[in-house]
């Protein structure tokens, strides 16, 4: 594949109309791409769990996984739009996604419900840690709008994490 027609390389940060210097936005875009990659990988993981979940709690988990990948898809959209607005290029190449994601990518295969949820919780917790660091970083760099965006995503990510914790309560998802 050739790069004919390439207008901006992934590592290139263009000037923006938001009044933020590229010395600032380059740091912000790097962090946002880590978050974007992590959410794109998590989207695929939730979608796989939605497709493959089985067992006594099928319906509630099937719906939860669908709601979760829908919410994560919204985060992907918002982060990608913000990256573009800041003059960056949203990450999309599968190998780059794997490189930038902040959590261990689940292996291929079908897992039992408890294991699926444990993998999802570990991913959400890693993303929460990343989001908290990014929120502090963008605030220190003077980008309040990105901070506001990240805080909204942080709240929704926390909510998914504690919902997963409820599914993992000791009296649920027992093996027969």
Swiss-Prot record:
Positions annotated to bind Fe cation 2: 81
Gene3D superfamilies referenced in this protein's UniProt entry, alphabetically: 1.20.1260.10
GO molecular function, a single term: oxidoreductase activity, acting on metal ions
EC number: 1.16.-.-
Descriptive protein name: DNA protection during starvation protein
CDD domains on file: DPS
Catalytic activity: 2 Fe(2+) + H2O2 + 2 H(+) = 2 Fe(3+) + 2 H2O
Inducing stimuli: The dps-DNA complex accumulates during stationary phase and under nitrogen, sulfur, and phosphate stress, but not under iron limitation.
Family: Belongs to the Dps family.
Needed co-factor(s): heme
Function: Protects DNA from oxidative damage by sequestering intracellular Fe(2+) ion and storing it in the form of Fe(3+) oxyhydroxide mineral. One hydrogen peroxide oxidizes two Fe(2+) ions, which prevents hydroxyl radical production by the Fenton reaction. Dps binds the chromosome non-specifically, forming a highly ordered and stable dps-DNA co-crystal within which chromosomal DNA is condensed and protected from diverse damages.
Keyword Iron: yes
Gene name for this UniProt entry: dps
Residues noted as binding Fe cation 1 in the record, renumbered to the chain: 50, 78, 81
Cofactor note: Binds 1 heme per molecule.
GO cellular component, one term: cytoplasm
PROSITE patterns attached to this UniProt entry: DPS_1 (PS00818), DPS_2 (PS00819)
Subcellular location: Cytoplasm
Cross-referenced InterPro entries: DPS_DNA-bd (IPR002177), DPS_DNA-bd_CS (IPR023188), Ferritin-like (IPR012347), Ferritin-like_SF (IPR009078), Ferritin_DPS_dom (IPR008331)
Subunit structure: Homohexamer.
Keyword terms of this UniProt record: Cytoplasm, DNA condensation, DNA-binding, Heme, Iron, Iron storage, Metal-binding, Oxidoreductase
Gene Ontology biological process terms from the UniProt entry: chromosome condensation; intracellular iron ion homeostasis
Organism the protein comes from: Synechococcus elongatus (strain ATCC 33912 / PCC 7942 / FACHB-805) (Anacystis nidulans R2)
Top-level taxonomy: Bacteria, Bacillati, Cyanobacteriota, Cyanophyceae, Synechococcales
């Amino acid at each position: 594949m050739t790069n004919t027609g390439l207008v901006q390389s992934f590592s290139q940060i263009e000037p923006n109309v938001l009044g933020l210097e590229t010395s600032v936005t380059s740091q912000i875009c790097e962090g946002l791409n880590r978050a974007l990659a992590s959410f794109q990988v998590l989207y695929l993981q939730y979608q796989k769990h939605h497709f493959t979940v089985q067992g006594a709690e099928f319906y509630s988990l099937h719906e939860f996984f669908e709601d979760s990948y829908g919410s994560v898809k919204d985060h992907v959209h918002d982060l990608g739009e913000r990256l573009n607005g800041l003059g960056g290029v949203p990450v999309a190449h599968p190998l780059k996604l794997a490189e930038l994601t902040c959590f261990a990518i689940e292996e291929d295969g079908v897992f039992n419900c408890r294991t699926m949820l444990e993998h999802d919780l570990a991913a959400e917790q890693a993303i929460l840690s990343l989001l908290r660091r990014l929120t502090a970083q963008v605030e220190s760099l003077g980008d309040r709008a990105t901070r506001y965006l990240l805080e909204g995503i942080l709240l929704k990510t926390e909510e998914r994490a504690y919902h997963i914790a409820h599914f993992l309560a000791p009296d649920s998802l027992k093996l027969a």
